[in-house]
Amino acid sequence: MKSELHIGYLIFISVVAALGGFLFGYDTAVISGTIKDVSTLFSLDAMQQGWYVGCALIGSIAGVSVAGVLRDRLGRKPVLILSAVLFTASAAGCAVCADFNQLVIYRIIGGVGIGMVSIVSPLYISEMAVPRYRGRLVSLYQLAVTVGFLGAYLVNFQLLEYAVAHAGENTDSTFGLLFIGQSWRGMLGMETVPALLFLIIAFFVPESPKWLIVERGRREKAVSILQRIYSDRREAEAQADCTASVLSDNASSSISMIFRPGIFKAVVCGVCIAILGQFMGVNAVLYYGPSIFEDAGLSQGDSLFYQVMVGLMNTLTTVLALVIIDKVGRKQLVYWGVSGMIVSLLLIAAYFLWGNTLGVSSLWLLFFFLAYVFCCAVSICAVVFVLLSEMYPARVRGLAMSIAGLALWIGTYLIGQLTPWMLSTLTPAGTFLVFAAMCVPYIYIMYRHIPETTGRSLEEIERHWTGGKC
């Protein structure tokens, strides 16, 4: 008879780790409401504006680069705490910075936190969760990211409304400066609230049992933590033994292990799905949606409203993905979702080619974008962090996830920099045709090379690669 699961405890530690995803989303999206005021205050030219937006991504690349090493040496929990410290320092520093250079430095610090948490949070959740619930629990991270996006949009809107309503009042006080005179400081500074919450409660989650066994050989400590999840000690010991048995053929962890045939294939596949996902258009839509809608002839107000609808669809669909990911399966979601993305992207391109000429309502463009975001959020956005946290052998998981995460952030940075150029040079229609074309190799790699991980233990998934089953 199987022991009873303490699902409430699993949810608690998953939510704590997923709070890092909320900070990821907030830190990424809040910048959109501050660009105009920051540019005016510090007299930024176009290149400096681009640097202001992109500097955090440079920090994210640095954070990803060191996250794997730090979490394998220090543990998953200390890196979560460190990322919370970085988020807090970044938000507070941005709120009180004296000049543009200081602002950039604090944004880079926050970016390092983003990079770390984007790797550590989903991995930590996957290592704590049982196979039955792992997909849904890891998807909490992606849900938290989308909620962070919405949270930033709402904070930006409310603080701007407050600043306008109280214009002319005394701004000599700190409160007046942050929320009236220079409300962009308040937008960035409000992140300190969830960051401090994350910092405090991160101390109350346990270390990953798998890390304790893999890196420290502390089986008894791992069993005691597993007993908080499994009510029966025998079941906890069985889980610990299962983890240890997978490691029996690997005496040590080293970079050279990455180049073993089965493991190297897993790493290459992870890099491919990480970077290709960024060139299928999702971040271009989330970052530059209002500009794209304005290119279609909409007013600034209508463009912002349409972007809010896109954000709401992203969040609501992520909730749906959270419910069905362990029932439908990772690969099935990708097949159907990416196929829908291709159709939606082709329809968006067609609208930009012929929509205005034929007098097609802009509501159809909104519908096509919502369909695209739905298909994307229910498939690649929901699946990528789950797969990257599941698919690697235990002894190289930290390094392999860092490599994939680095590829993801490089792709994010490139698409963020290239999208304005693509829209002006290739036209919006050509840009979305390129995004549609990039979906094809993604489906091929998923079909041909990635194993289905739904309902399988991390140890079973590891045997897929090391056993040479391709």
Q: PLM features: what roles do these ranges have?
A:
Residues 1-218, 225, 248-470:
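Alpha-helical transmembrane bundle of multi-pass membrane proteins
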Residues 219, 227-232:
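TPR/TPR-like (Sel1-like) alpha-helical repeat modules
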Residues 221-222, 242:
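N-terminal juxtamembrane cytosolic/stromal segments of multi-pass membrane proteins
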Residues 233-247:
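Short, well-structured alpha-helical segments
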